[in-house]
Amino acid sequence: MIEYPLNYYTLVYAHLATILPAFAIGTYMMIRQKGSTQHKFLGKIYLLLMLTTASIALFIPAFAGPRLLLNHFGLIHLLCILTIYTCPAAYIAIKKGETKKHRYLMIYLYVGGLIIAGFFTLMPGRFLGELLFNSKLLS
């Protein structure tokens, strides 16, 4: 079993505190009508949560898979960088009236930043995967 440093847990729980509401809001917004006042309000919250969670995740060291840079960053951190780029790009697109580009970027953000990243986070050897699927970590 991997021994995680104490600040690792703080970062992971802060990441969870932002990603879980982002996932709920993102899912809700994907299935609801677009363009309403509520959509615009929730969209801003969603983007702030995604930017925050991606920024927090950059400080979480990779303990599973290859470490690509500075013995800290792994492949999953590439999704953080893409999220940090996509959030303002999607916001700028909608402010310019580029709804098709905005829609594409938001779907990309949801699939890449939430679904794919979430899948990799639950893999064996990662903290959340071990927490959910390995009863030894809970005891």
Regions found by a protein language model. Name each.
Residues M1-S139:
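Alpha-helical membrane insertion/targeting regions
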